[in-house]
Amino acid sequence: MKVVIIDNYDSFTYNLAHLVKELGVDVTVYRNDQFQLRELEPFDKIILSPGPGIPSEAGLLMDVIRKYAGIKPMLGVCLGHQAIGEAFGAKLTNLKEVYHGVATPCTQFGIDRIFQGMEKRIEIGRYHSWVVDRTNFPECLDVTAVSDDGCIMGLKHKNYDIHGIQFHPESVLTPEGKTIVKNFLEL
């Protein structure tokens, strides 16, 4: 299997790549503005990395989702998760309280296979100031996990193999993070 990570200029991207390599999978990293969409054709799965800012400012990130939705499985992390939400019609909300390097519990609803084998309550590492808004949430997506403060921490597309997590699976603050990535790779 070959996986590509779209790097949204985030310091965590290579931690995520290292985690994928640890799981025995060939991984390539492309910066979000230094490739052409057709270069993703040889890859089996796409991971959309965390990053600063908002999805519309992240190079080809939104174009990747639009072109490969329904064609290639995707996992969006943090900014990548937000981009998935926006690509399918969700809006983002800027949080009043910023979460940077904060461990909090969240509840996953058992409806996404990336959480397979986990307890309903899991600890997650949060590094964000934006979230996908629950208001007017798109019909084509399911909320798969929420934080105790009601923020969407996970989503998936109802028809496509597309999953998003607001938190960082590669962080030591997310003890089940490696399992989440492994589950995505095995889908």
Describe each region flagged by the PLM.
Residues 1-4:
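Extreme N-terminal starter segment of soluble prokaryotic enzymes
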Residues 17-25:
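Two-component/phosphorelay signaling modules centered on CheY-like receiver
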Residues 112-159:
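Catalytic beta-strand/loop cores that center a nucleophilic Ser/Cys/Thr
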Residues 26-34:
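A short beta-strand-loop structural module common to alpha/beta enzyme folds
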Residues 12, 53-55, 172:
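Active-site beta-alpha loop architecture of Rossmann-like, nucleotide-cofactor-dependent enzymes
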Residues 43-117, 181-183:
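Cysteine-nucleophile active-site neighborhood
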Residues 172-187:
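Acyltransferase
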Residues 35-43:
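Short amphipathic alpha-helix with an adjacent loop that forms part of the alpha/beta core around
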